[in-house]
């Protein structure tokens, strides 16, 4: 009976569309080099030219928050990154954040800033990937998110060319990001062959 009750609770609790959960070494941000559990959520409204996770646009299964936390607990790390796609498009992502934080995990969320980041739990580390002009999604950033950036956050610009670099540098200066956030990252990406 107790097992049936637990299963009923799992069925009625909030669910998220999960693309994958995996263990790897953190490759970006100031946590680079550390073991990390990644929870990749399904879906993204953007179509950045350099996207390397387009499989997350449509592939994924609905899972309860409890089952996600249970799977993460089997991985040998206390660092978790919620990513996508764009994780903030799923309303129950906040329930997942809180569940992981309440279990004592250090939680990162990588977001494009296309949605309101102020709704995130204040204990979380937000990695805000501000889209540059060459991404094809530069107009997607919610301008009010600049006002909500804090020292717990990091900002990332994926740089495809010199114009992107200049734009990111100007944005860093005009938004006074240095000193307002934990770190600002300029991450170069190779352009398509023949366009360098």
Report residues per predicted region:
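N-terminal amphipathic/basic-hydrophobic helices that include classical n-h-c signal peptides
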Residues: 1-10
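Short, charged low-complexity linear segments at domain edges
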Residues: 11-35
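Short amphipathic alpha-helical segments, especially helix-boundary/capping motifs
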Residues: 12-13, 44-46, 71-74, 143-147, ...
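Conserved Radical SAM active-site core
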Residues: 16-20, 35-38, 42, 46-125
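Generic structural signal for well-ordered alpha-helical scaffold segments
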Residues: 26, 69-73, 173
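Short linear functional motifs in flexible/disordered or boundary regions
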Residues: 30, 51, 60-63, 80, ...
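Conserved AdoMet/S-adenosylmethionine-binding subsite of the radical SAM
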Residues: 88-196
């Amino acid at each position: 009976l107790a097992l049936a009750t637990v299963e009923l609770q799992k069925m009625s609790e909030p669910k998220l569309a999960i693309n994958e959960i995996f263990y790897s070494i953190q490759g970006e941000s100031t946590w680079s080099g550390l073991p990390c559990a990644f929870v990749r959520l399904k879906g993204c409204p953007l179509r950045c030219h350099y996207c390397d996770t387009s499989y997350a646009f449509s592939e994924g299964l609905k899972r309860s928050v409890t089952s996600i936390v249970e799977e993460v607990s089997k991985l040998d790390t206390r660092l978790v990154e919620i990513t996508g796609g764009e994780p903030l498009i799923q309303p129950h992502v906040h329930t997942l954040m809180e569940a992981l934080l309440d279990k004592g995990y250090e939680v990162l969320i990588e977001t494009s800033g296309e949605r309101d980041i102020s709704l995130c739990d204040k204990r979380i580390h937000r990695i805000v990937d501000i889209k540059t002009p060459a991404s094809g999604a530069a107009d997607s950033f919610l301008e009010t998110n600049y006002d909500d950036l804090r020292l717990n956050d990091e900002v990332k610009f994926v740089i495809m060319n010199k114009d992107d670099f200049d734009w990111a540098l100007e944005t860093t200066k005009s938004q006074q990001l240095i000193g307002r956030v934990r770190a600002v990252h300029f991450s170069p990406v190779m352009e398509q062959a023949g366009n360098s």
